[in-house]
Amino acid sequence: MRLWLALIAGVLAGPTHAQTWATREVCLLDEARVHPEIFTPAFYANLQTRSAEIPNSVGRFWRITSVDGAVSHMWGTMHSSLPMILRLPNQVTDTIKAARIVATEVDYTQQTREELSASHTSSDRYRDATEISVRDMALPSQLLIWIEERLIGLGWGDEALDYLSPAALAELMLADPCGDFAAGIYPIQDDRIQMLGAIHGSKILSLEAPRALFQKLSDDGGAGLTRAMIAVYANYLNPAITQEMRSTSHALYLQGRIGEMMAWDELYFSEAYPEEGPDWLARTNDYLLRERNEVFLGSAMADLLEGGVFMAVGTYHLPQEYGLIALLRKAGFAVERIALEGEARP
């Protein structure tokens, strides 16, 4: 679900507000390239060392073959609506068009009029008397300032921090402020893939129920997982983010250097919040990646055995020993990388 954490380790915000930094000039990139000057030499060396330790850390496009020879494909997405991210390689687009099934993390199209009505009322997104307030979660005060500014920018008002439930707040934090400019006009890459599949006659498979994330966080009651997710995603609101940082993170994605993106997150939280940062990230990843990967695989298994599936999930779901590449191999599938032009070699 995460895109990247475009922050230099150790850089904390000045007086700039969390919403005002996300201007069109910062957000709408003309090109993506790595800017090595944004890293200290020591940080970059540690980043390279850590990324080399992450299994299956290079590549976005993978062929999946069952023991009976049925072929499917998996693509690591970036949850972004930038044209450079929406511009998929021809080989990927052709595979989507030919797919029997296009599977995405969540199919958010409404299935009934009742679901549509419920999505507009949002009554369960308001905090009741039994739920903890985000202000009482003992989070760093700077994070609360960034969150409050973000909520104001989204139109929730300056009191939303007090009346939204922890689950609703965590879910709202998932949206990148830089996506605001094209919201409702340009789809994020995942939604474009789903749309292409639908246009070309593919069946759409939702790998997870639409409200699964919200329900998980609601059941958590604002405890460990929800608090950790709020802390992690509040850091995406850091006003220290620059266009060079965003350019670098997008370049790493387009070059298939996914392990470096994940290592960047790890090192940032270890250095910026040495006491709690690693635990925040670990708790978040344990659910968003590790636990949900098992759900995704279970949802797709029968169709993968038959073949013809194009599975599109956030690119962080692919690497690591708990990633989908490793889980698919453990389940008996052959998983081979399809290297694309411009991507790095392992």
Model-predicted segments: where are they?
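Sec-dependent signal peptide recognition
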Residues: 1-7
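N-terminal signal peptide c-region/cleavage motif recognized by signal peptidases
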Residues: 13-15
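Structured, acidic catalytic/metal-binding patches in enzyme active sites
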Residues: 20-284
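C-terminal soluble interaction/assembly domains
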Residues: 282-346
